[in-house]
Design a protein with these regions (language model features):
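Hydrophobic anchor at the beta1->P-loop junction of P-loop NTPases
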Residues: 6
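P-loop (Walker A) phosphate-binding loop of NTP-binding proteins
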Residues: 9
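ATP-binding Walker
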Residues: 12
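Walker A/P-loop
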Residues: 15
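Conserved substrate/cofactor phosphate-moiety recognition/catalytic segment
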Residues: 19-65
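Glycine-rich phosphate-binding loop used to anchor ATP phosphates in small-molecule kinases
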Residues: 55-97
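Conserved phosphate-donor/acceptor-positioning beta-strand/loop module used by diverse small-molecule
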Residues: 96-117
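Small-molecule kinase domains that catalyze NTP-dependent phosphoryl transfer to phosphate-bearing small molecules
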Residues: 121-162
């Protein structure tokens, strides 16, 4: 079965898209969210893994191995989270997860700031670090030839339909 991985910075719409697909296609698509494992404090990440990047990479490997096992059960898999495309690629190779597609869910900075500050009431996330992270992921997706789904002016329904075409 197909494994679709939605990556992106906060506010891009990946969780909203995943939740929409989960509610409409629960019989055929199993949805997983990276953050549901719990995100430790920065101090805990450093103490346990050496850096936030190392924590993220280790958890990406854990997730990809879990997704690989879930895909063998015969259902389509949708996973969303914030991690590097390079970590997903390395983990997929190690897990033998060859049939997957990684998509960047993205939006412009103005839309991201509005979603984080107004819609989610988390203005502290709409900072330069998040915009830099979004730019990093955009560059990584482009250089790796990954699909980019720009949700800036696209409805949630249209975005969900776009992702679901990978399950057809």
């Amino acid at each position: 079965m197909t494994v679709v991985i939605l990556l992106g910075a906060s506010g891009a719409g990946k969780t909203t898209i995943a939740e929409t697909i989960a509610s409409r296609h629960a019989d055929t698509v199993e949805v997983f969210h990276f953050d549901r494992i719990g995100v430790p404090t920065l101090a805990e990440m450093i103490a346990d893994y050496g850096s936030p990047e190392a924590w993220q990479r280790a958890k990406t490997f854990d997730w990809i191995f879990r997704l690989s096992a879930a895909a063998r059960r015969g259902r389509h898999i949708l996973f969303e989270g914030q991690t590097r495309f390079s970590s997903v690629s390395e983990a997929a190779l190690a897990a033998g997860l060859l049939d997957h597609v990684a998509i960047l869910v993205d939006c412009d900075d103005e839309t991201r700031c509005g979603r984080l500050s107004i819609d989610r009431k988390q203005p502290e996330l709409a900072d330069r670090h998040m915009m830099d992270w979004a730019r990093f992921l955009r560059t990584e997706a482009t250089s790796g030839g990954h699909e980019i789904l720009d949700t800036s002016a696209q409805s949630v329904d249209a975005s969900a339909r776009h992702v679901c075409r990978h399950f057809a």
